[in-house]
């Protein structure tokens, strides 16, 4: 870390803690920041734009304009009694002359292409020509709407070509801007234009960078909003508090330079770190979003603070140096405060937005998990249990789409209410000033001189109003009126004393609801924070419980004098918990009373089964009154169901071994098993799990778990990993990814079967079946259908991508629906479905089609082992290994007529990995298809394995079990990939192929060197005690495994 960073690193932690607090209470922080910024926004804009102070009541019969403003818009003419000429006066001069005869001359032109149109009748008309009327009155009257005798409505318009005369608005804006910029030379204008172009490029880069890290719009918009809030707060501070206002022109010129210099790189880096951290976090780590935001700010905050402090010191220095230039000093002060507020808002407002983005990502990932599990055949109750476990670390209110909409609506509604009044007043002022009036000098008409008008012989002033145009009311005028009326009505309603208070109250209620939901979410977050401690307490409970059991069984023995443990309050609590649960989860009890069977049946029919003791429930099962498979549903306690089933089977099978704990059953999450992995559960089978590695695969290091009971298998694969790493690691290529299901159907005749095959092979048939199949799943996508005929039997092989799930159940659902559509919609009514699976898949059976066409993931893994490593690590030589591989794996397997078995022991590694990682063990039949190739390259050994049918998934099936899921976490591939569906399953297939590569390399080396038997004798025959059966002891049963843990 550089020296400047070291000096400010102590400032990072307060900012990181602030960011974590904001992430915990995002709605609170966002609302407070928006309210403060909105207050500053209203104050600043009212100061900079004075014309917004007009009342919005001009939508009446006559325009209600302030007299002073209307007087300024008129062209004034004066004639004294002693003169016959009219003198042009300014507004100030006309106001200084007092005369009782002051008239307003209005010129009204009716725009109509039809000369026969009936025009409205008007009062005070002194002259008319064609469709133009001149009105002379003592008060200005400009009606917005007139009605002719035939009912035609005429609407006031500046001209008849543009709605609201947007052209004039644009023209006046350009004129004002031109007047301001005329003071600059061309070089300055070029610099300003370049600054705005660079500003546009910076904004484009912001959206592009955010899109790359996973946000299409909202994070970019949030970054801009953060800077805008900082601008408004700094403008309010300098303008209202410090009385150092920066001119509007300086803001227009200087802000692009500030934005370009500072940029948005730090906000992009904060977002990138947070999203990448979220993607790297495995599902079961349960890290909270607030901790991710804390780490992001802690890692990136030093650079953020360093750069902002540098900018702030630069502006302060500039203000001191140029103190003789007030405009520049004020702008430097504004820039300084803008940086300060932007820094604070980055740790509050922007961090809160980031936390909400992460929460939404968690919701999305968890929803994908639940939908995938349900599509893969896991019952909804089990899927919900897993879904809740995955989302337990997230705030509860964000799981509800209604709550998300409520939070967003609160903020968006606030912004709309703030801007509606401003927008309405601005619209009204703009219409009045740029549409109805302009600064043109209007000449006095000639008819004034000869027209017989009373009082014109006296001292008189005539103020000529701008010419007004009226057009017949059309449809688009009505639409415009409706829009303006709605805006005006809402604006007036907001300003109403009662409604404004009601809206404020409603907004307060909205915030209170969000606060309530957030407080409710703390319960779930606190539960997850407490869960690690509760796990420790559970372990203590198990230890204390085991110790209690052993003590009760050996209480006749003398007490140990040297191992006494003091009793604490926690021990008392744990003992009470044990006593409360002992009656439910006890394996056997001699003191349990058993009621008559008839009474038990009667209670069961009244759904009182849960209130019976275990022996009574077991008695119902033994006597055939309660099915063995229905215990979980009836008892609503999966662990108790396992216990009762063991008691019942110990009687039915006359095997008291199930009463003991030699087959363990305690401390296991059977909720994940029920409906997903196994039925009639009586416990679980512990299998030793070893680990090999690290193994470098495509540049990434992995520790790979293996569950096996075969000695020296893990040690052998470990040696292979060491040799592969010495050569730089393994590289992989995935050539195919598609699970298959092969239904068989029958037609009455061969002609119809052949016609259906031709249709399915055609583009029309493929597209029709794809459309039907893809409609059944969010994840499964049909790639291709392969067909073949055997008599009138038609076999179809559906190849489908299934995301990160292995996907057999998912595909079966799509196949069933596709076959149904063929019968009902595509004209194959005479088709008979023989079986959804016609062994053309082929699943869990050796088949050449899997070896040739592939099934699941097709992976090729390769590694180059240096010659000296072959000698030093593998204790062999390159030529011997190449010769062995040809003779054994290629020629030997061919002589045996093997299909896909051109390897040494790929099934060993595949099965061990499948058991450890929750895969279907039966699918090792086709997943173990492998051909191992070796050749010598420049004295080194190049070895590869090609496995065309690895069938794996990282969600569903056995992966829902916590131990297997934890091993997937060890590899970093648990659950669905957050951004690229199927990436985790494909990576798992690569890892399995590389593990097979390591096992093949080590075993072939042992065979070439003649070490195989020796290694097995060493690892599997270490002592004679390992092979001895345990003998009963008079001192009591052996110590339980749970007690040792």
From Swiss-Prot:
Family: Belongs to the HMG-CoA reductase family.
Gene name of the record: HMG2
Record-level GO cellular component terms: endoplasmic reticulum; endoplasmic reticulum membrane; nuclear envelope; nuclear periphery; peroxisomal membrane; proteasome complex
Identification of the protein by name: 3-hydroxy-3-methylglutaryl-coenzyme A reductase 2
One Gene Ontology term of the molecular function aspect: hydroxymethylglutaryl-CoA reductase (NADPH) activity
InterPro entries for this protein: HMG-CoA_N_dom, HMG_CoA_Rdtase, HMG_CoA_Rdtase_cat_sf, HMG_CoA_Rdtase_CS, HMG_CoA_Rdtase_eu_arc, HMG_CoA_Rdtase_N, HMG_CoA_Rdtase_NAD(P)-bd_sf, HMG_CoA_Rdtase_sub-bd_dom_sf
Residues that bind NADP(+): 777-779, 804-812, 1020-1021
Pathway named in the protein's UniProt entry: Metabolic intermediate biosynthesis; (R)-mevalonate biosynthesis; (R)-mevalonate from acetyl-CoA: step 3/3
